[in-house]
A protein has these predicted regions:
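Phosphate-binding site of ATP-dependent enzymes
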Residues: 1-73, 77-80, 108
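ATP-dependent carboxylate activation and anion-phosphoryl transfer catalytic cores
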Residues: 69-147
Length: 147
């Protein structure tokens, strides 16, 4: 037989946090994926179709938006968690940390993306803009962090 990796499904909201920096880290405003139509909870995960198939996204009312404001303690916990993950994985320059926010307000780490999509209209760039970093400056900053 073949070995398989089986993981527990974590129910909750899909949250994406961009992190920039090498020594001094900055968390960008968080984004989340929301579903406009009722879908079984177990089917709510970011598959290829969910992320990239525009017809599928329209059919199910899937969109990404900024995470509504959290309580200050939860926001602080989110940022500390993302920075700890970034450092633990020895990431540098920029990355995106994907988590689930459970009904108990716990953040569960799903994965780190060390090379997230940087298109102007994608989550990372939109979060940078909300943080006051316009697209040309974002690209300049990423290049300077790589130097």
């Amino acid at each position: 037989g073949q070995e398989a990796l089986v993981e527990e499904f974590v129910e909750g909201r899909e949250v994406y946090v961009g992190v920039m920096g090498n020594n001094r880290l900055q968390c960008l405003p968080a984004r989340e994926m929301v579903w406009g139509r009722e879908v079984p909870v177990q089917a709510r995960f970011a598959s290829y179709r969910v992320k990239w198939d525009e017809d599928y996204r329209k059919r199910w009312g899937i969109r990404n938006r900024f995470l509504p404001p959290l309580a200050k303690s939860a926001q602080r916990r989110l940022e500390v968690t993302c920075k700890e993950i970034y450092r633990h994985l020895q990431l540098n320059g920029y990355a995106r940390i994907d988590l689930r926010l459970t009904a108990d307000n716990e953040f569960v780490f799903i994965e780190a993306n060390p090379n997230p999509m940087l298109a102007r209209d994608e989550d990372f760039a939109l979060s940078a803009r909300k943080a006051g970093l316009e697209y040309p400056k974002l690209i300049e900053r990423i290049i300077s962090l790589a130097a």
